[in-house]
């Protein structure tokens, strides 16, 4: 950026020249006053490893395989890859740019459009909801990890008090099969476990791994109308250990989390490849892999499949919740984020495929051992897949199942830590950006204690009900709708050309047509259509095929309303605190960049002001003949943009 020799001018440019003020003025704006230097990553590799650790997580190993299977198998890869290129990659790159350009967290970046600051607060709310239950999954993972060191895996055999139980040891299944007990078809399956048919009547048998999870680990309640119960002390202890680890990783900010990122990002691949090699050598693995990859082409015409592809993409890449913005804010201003964005989004997809092949190879072996023709009968979703199907399959390994169990659950724990560290750091960064004098480690400690206390509700007998409710209302939909507003605020209000100019200044490269078309049209339009479809087809949520009490659904919608309402409420608050005559003028003014928008470093900011002022005359003479561009510009102008 060869701009050093040009005399700077003060102001906050909007891209049309109005931000340029008298160059001779010696008075500095608030944005130009020296600010405390923001901590940077030790090197660019730490940033890359951190992004990998958050984006390549539990969603790749235990959510993607089942989601793909339920939505067309191999055919699901087509809408998923399309969604990745039209929504996932553009949103990921956009959030990286926003964080690095301003060196600010999820809330402070909205100096670009102050009236949209509620997007940042709403995303923080959604992130807190996700953190609250994510840590409970770590507690379950730790519990299984600890008990895997026993001489015999505790879920591989039945207890005396369990009726209709079949040991998860392979020989026990063979014994049952030899006595003439055959597995029921899919219509005989129910929430309680594997349906078995004997003497022309359906006898409900459950594997010991399922009964162990339901009766010993979570002590499941099937009715929460009278409350969720008390926290289990073993899971509470595991939850405490998980939060201690989280705090130790984030206590020194990127100085500590950046070093941990190498292990958090790379170790899961070591274990995943070990499990892959073992899985593909098992009998029945080929059938499981083909079952996973076999396309069901008719599903491509199902709108639900496309909706699930978007949800999976958001969940997997962690866009819309703040971690990517937060991580990028600790980069040097000239860091090459384009390369990192391409690496992470591509690696994320490949890891999902790798995880799917590994998991379905194991499930194929499980079906082979059970002599089940339809692998659907051994597939579970969500928590059941991680803590029932996997342990059940591992217990059937002939050689050292304890070793593979330890490796598997330690891998899950590391994947979970990588994700929750990013989410927790997002909240800590938001607080520290707001209150500059607060010590980072003290904020990290306080938020970790709060996270532990919130997590207690999920380690109760009714905890899985609450997890399902919070994830559905407070996580998925809040994050999704605010991501739409996030994109609209940058592209339609601040202006696509303004944003592209900022990227050109920071990265010293022009923005390609692909990014422009995605940001201005394909990404927002697809997201809006899918959100409307999701709302129009929404159904009451269920847990284990049981509907939630009416009061729980009311609480869920209230949770969603609180998260979504952050956007308009904070916008109105900002307009009232910065009056510009009439209230309508104040609202329009809140849609223009504030003096604080721009690079954090004063010298870099002055260079950016010059660059923008040089660009303004060029853009004033350009004529956009695109009807689409004209349409979006009219919308932006109506909203008060100076595009």
From Swiss-Prot:
It holds the Pfam family SNF. Residues 8-26 have a biased composition (Low complexity). Its main location: membrane. Residues 1-40 are cytoplasmic. It is a multi-pass membrane protein. Residues 27-36 have a biased composition (Basic and acidic residues). It comes from the Eukaryota. One of its GO terms (biological process) is neutral amino acid transport. GO terms for molecular function: amino acid:sodium symporter activity; D-amino acid transmembrane transporter activity; L-amino acid transmembrane transporter activity; neutral L-amino acid transmembrane transporter activity. Residues 1-38 are annotated as: Disordered. The keyword Glycoprotein applies. The chain crosses the membrane at residues 41-61, 74-94, 111-131, 231-251, 260-280, 309-329, 343-363, 403-423, 449-469, 476-496, 518-538, 554-574. Keywords: Amino-acid transport, Glycoprotein, Ion transport, Membrane, Sodium, Sodium transport, Symport, Transmembrane, Transmembrane helix, Transport. Glycans are attached at residues 185, 190, 200. It is found in: Membrane. GO terms for cellular component: plasma membrane. Belongs to the sodium:neurotransmitter symporter (SNF) (TC 2.A.22) family. Unusual broad substrate spectrum amino acid:sodium cotransporter that promotes absorption of the D isomers of essential amino acids. Neutral amino acids are the preferred substrates, especially methionine and phenylalanine. NCBIfam families: Na_transp (NF037979). This is Sodium-dependent nutrient amino acid transporter 1. The gene is NAAT1.
């Amino acid at each position: 950026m060869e701009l050093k020799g040009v005399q700077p001018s003060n102001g906050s440019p909007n891209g049309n020249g109005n931000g340029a003020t008298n160059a001779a003025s010696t008075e500095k704006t608030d944005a130009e006053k020296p600010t405390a230097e923001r901590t940077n990553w030790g090197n660019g590799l730490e940033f890359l490893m951190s992004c990998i650790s958050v984006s390549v997580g539990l969603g790749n190993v235990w959510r993607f395989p089942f989601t793909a299977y339920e939505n067309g198998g191999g055919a699901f890869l087509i809408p998923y890859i399309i969604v990745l290129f039209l929504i996932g990659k553009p949103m990921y790159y956009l959030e990286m740019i926003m964080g690095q350009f301003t060196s600010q967290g999820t809330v402070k970046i909205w100096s670009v459009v102050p009236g949209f600051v509620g997007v940042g607060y709403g995303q923080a709310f959604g992130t807190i909801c996700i953190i609250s239950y994510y840590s409970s999954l770590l507690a379950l993972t730790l519990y299984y990890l600890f008990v895997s060191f026993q001489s015999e895996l505790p879920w591989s055999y039945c207890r005396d008090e369990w009726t209709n139980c079949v040991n998860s040891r392979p020989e026990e299944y063979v014994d049952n099969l030899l006595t003439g007990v055959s597995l029921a078809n899919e219509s005989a399956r129910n929430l309680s476990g594997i349906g078995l048919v004997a003497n022309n009547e359906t006898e409900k048998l459950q594997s010991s791994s399922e009964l162990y999870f339901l009766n010993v680990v979570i002590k499941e309640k099937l009715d929460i109308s009278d409350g969720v119960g008390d926290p289990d002390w073993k899971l509470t202890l595991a939850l405490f250990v998980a939060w201690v680890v989280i705090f130790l990783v984030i206590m020194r900010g990127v100085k500590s989390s950046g070093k941990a990122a190498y292990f958090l990002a790379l170790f899961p691949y070591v274990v995943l490849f070990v499990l892959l090699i073992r899985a593909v050598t098992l009998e029945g693995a080929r059938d499981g892999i083909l079952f996973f990859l076999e396309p069901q082409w008719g599903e491509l015409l199902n709108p639900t499949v496309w909706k699930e592809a978007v949800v999976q993409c958001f969940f997997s890449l962690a866009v819309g919740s703040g971690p990517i913005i937060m991580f990028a804010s600790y980069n040097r201003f000239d860091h090459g984020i384009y390369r990192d964005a391409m690496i992470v989004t591509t690696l994320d997809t490949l890891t999902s495929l790798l995880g799917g092949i590994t998991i379905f190879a194991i499930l194929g072996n499980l079906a082979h051992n059970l002599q089940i023709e339809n692998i659907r009968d051994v597939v579970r979703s969500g928590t059941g897949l991680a803590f029932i199907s996997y342990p059940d399959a591992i217990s059937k390994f002939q050689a050292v199942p304890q070793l593979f169990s330890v490796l598997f659950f330690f891998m899950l724990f590391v994947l979970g830590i990588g994700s929750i560290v990013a989410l927790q750091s997002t909240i800590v960064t938001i607080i520290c950006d707001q209150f500059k004098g607060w010590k980072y480690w003290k904020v990290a400690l306080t938020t970790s204690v709060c996270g532990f206390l919130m997590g207690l509700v999920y380690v109760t007998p009714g905890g899985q009900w609450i997890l399902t409710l919070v994830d559905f209302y407070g996580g998925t939909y809040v994050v999704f709708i605010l991501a739409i507003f996030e994109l609209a605020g940058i592209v339609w209000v601040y202006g696509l050309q303004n944003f592209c100019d900022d990227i050109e200044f920071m990265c010293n490269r022009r923005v390609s047509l692909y990014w422009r078309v995605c940001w201005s049209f394909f990404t927002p339009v697809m997201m809006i259509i899918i959100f409307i479809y999701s709302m129009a087809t929404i159904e009451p949520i269920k847990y284990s095929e049981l509907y939630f009490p009416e009061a729980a659904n009311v609480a869920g919608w209230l949770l969603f309303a609180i998260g979504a309402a952050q956007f308009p409420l904070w916008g109105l608050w900002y307009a009232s605190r910065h009056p510009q005559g009439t209230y309508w003028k104040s609202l329009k003014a809140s849609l223009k960049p504030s003096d604080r928008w721009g690079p954090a470093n004063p010298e870099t900011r002055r260079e950016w002001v010059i660059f923008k002022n040089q660009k303004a005359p060029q853009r004033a003479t350009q004529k956009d003949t695109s009807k689409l561009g004209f349409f979006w510009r009219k919308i932006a102008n109506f909203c008060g943009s100076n595009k």
